[in-house]
């Protein structure tokens, strides 16, 4: 007896199609993968090389936001636009857009970090440039999901609104509720083993690390010469 093959499902976050010969669609397909690049290239690299509690909780917030998105999608069960048949994406729901929610969470949280002076900020001008970059990527990602046919306009705006709300709410939780416990996390067995730290209380952490790295190198050179 022959087995009837079942329809395969795709991972919606990385499943991107565009019309052959459509250069704009090709570009926007890559833009749609920005959340993946941020997740893997950004936060994984940050944890490996920085171990900052602010960055770790930033990443945790994005994961929580994704779970909220999936819960709402499976509860509302609003279908994607008719183009989902051509895109082979009709097996997943469309409201709200997870890509839009991810990017607007990221842009909102990042902007609030800048307003609070957390992270590597080089001055007011650079802060505006960084915020412009992140908000531009968020808007273009939202547009790409409509252009490529994965979502309706209402679905991407719903994702953007939800991402902004969840991002702002999580920022408040981290910096008002959890922040007093950062020293406890740093001094815990797991925190000391993983070398996690919090430098958000340092006004110019980039200069602080630069000066300390140079001082440490000078001390090493002096020790070798003795």
Swiss-Prot record:
Its EC number is 3.1.3.-. The chain crosses the membrane at residues 24-44, 52-72, 102-122, 128-148, 152-174. It is found in: Plastid, Chloroplast inner membrane. The modification N-acetylmethionine is found at residue 1. Expressed in root tips, root branch points, vascular tissue of cotyledons and leaves, pistil, anthers and filaments. Keywords: Acetylation, Chloroplast, Hydrolase, Membrane, Plastid, Plastid inner membrane, Transmembrane, Transmembrane helix. Optimum pH is 6.0-8.0. Belongs to the PA-phosphatase related phosphoesterase family. This is Lipid phosphate phosphatase gamma.
């Amino acid at each position: 007896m022959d087995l009837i093959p079942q329809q395969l499902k795709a991972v919606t976050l990385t499943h991107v199609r565009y019309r052959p010969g459509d250069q704009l669609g090709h570009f926007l397909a890559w833009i749609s993968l920005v959340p993946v690049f941020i997740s893997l290239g950004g936060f994984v690299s940050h944890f490996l090389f920085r171990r900052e509690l602010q960055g770790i909780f930033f990443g945790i917030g994005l994961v929580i936001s994704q779970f909220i998105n999936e819960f709402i999608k499976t509860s509302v069960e609003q279908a994607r636009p008719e183009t989902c048949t051509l895109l082979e994406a009709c097996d997943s729901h469309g409201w709200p857009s997870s890509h839009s929610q991810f990017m607007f969470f990221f842009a909102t949280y990042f902007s609030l970090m800048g307003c609070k002076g957390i992270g590597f900020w080089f001055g007011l001008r650079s802060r505006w440039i960084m915020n412009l970059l992140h908000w531009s990527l968020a808007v273009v990602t939202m547009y790409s999901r409509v252009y490529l046919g994965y979502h309706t306009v209402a679905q991407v705006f719903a994702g953007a609104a939800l991402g902004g709300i969840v991002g702002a709410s999580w920022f408040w939780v981290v910096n008002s509720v959890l922040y007093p416990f950062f020293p406890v996390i740093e001094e815990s067995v797991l925190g000391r083993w993983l070398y996690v730290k919090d430098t958000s209380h340092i006004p110019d952490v980039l200069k602080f690390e630069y000066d300390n790295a140079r001082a440490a190198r000078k001390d090493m050179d002096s020790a070798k010469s003795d």
